[in-house]
Amino acid sequence: MKHKIDVVKTLLDALPFIKKFSNEKIVVKYGGAAQTSAELKEQFAQDIVLLHLVGMKPIIVHGGGKSITQLLADLGVDTTFIDGQRVTTKEVMRIVEMVLSGEINKEIVSLLDNHGAKAIGISGKDGGFLKGMPKDFENFGYTGLIEDIDPEIVDNIIDDDAVPVIAPIAGSNILGHPGFNINADLAASRIAVALEARKILFLTDTPGVLDKEMELITNLSIEQTEALKEDGTIQGGMVPKVDACIEALRGGVKKAHIIDGRVEHSLLLEILTSSGVGTCIEL
């Protein structure tokens, strides 16, 4: 009986958050261990389906860097990085699109469908959703930046009561152009702004933003975040994550969260509990 009462209490505790975020768009950047562990994949799908069933509008933007690197190695295609960003030749671009659109995107859609949510997978090329431009073609090739976003196709998916699953590949207006490989964190941030999302969450392989003693910082303002970057507390791979958070917040998103995707049901814990499990950044 006690277990049953605990279940009811948990549901009641979540009720204020369900009411608060009902009918709100929530962008989730999906990557890291949560994207490679079979158990965590299932839990992620369950979390998204539950959020969708209680009236929220989750939008998934996924990466796939490790899978891309593995397939490139298997095929004997050289790949290089500059400052942590992949140099995308035309041959690499073809494989990037194969992995992101043809493999990972479809796997996520299938997972969500299997757990009871209607999901529709697209890339930024579909419906003219994302238009790209070169980051620095001479050095980075087809690694790009987002020039323009037309949210109509994603809005239509949401209006059809489905979950959009987006591969971060941008199209071009040039006939025959292979498109652009877009950093998934950057894509998620820009998409959240364009779709007027309430929240954006980044699933990572760390607990969140850590202080110099390696303790989790649960809440930050933009100013505090910038200061932690300047003094070197935030460094390495966390820098582009917090930059993406800041860009989203300055574009009108209310809150940005960096959470540990290795924690069971981390999405639900962050959205439906008062304490959360990661770092929340806000204006």
Curated annotation (Swiss-Prot):
Q: Write down the InterPro entries for this protein, in alphabetical order.
A: AceGlu_kinase-like_sf (IPR036393), AcgluKinase_fam (IPR004662), ArgB (IPR037528), Asp/Glu/Uridylate_kinase (IPR001048), Glu/AcGlu_kinase (IPR001057), NAGK-C (IPR041727)
Q: Does the keyword Kinase apply?
A: yes
Q: Matching Pfam families, A to Z?
A: AA_kinase
Keywords from UniProt, A to Z, are: Amino-acid biosynthesis, Arginine biosynthesis, ATP-binding, Cytoplasm, Kinase, Nucleotide-binding, Transferase
- Residues binding substrate are G64, G65, R86, N181
The family database entries (PANTHER family) matched by this protein are listed as: N-ACETYLGLUTAMATE SYNTHASE (PTHR23342), N-ACETYLGLUTAMATE SYNTHASE, MITOCHONDRIAL (PTHR23342:SF0)
Q: Know the name of this protein?
A: Acetylglutamate kinase
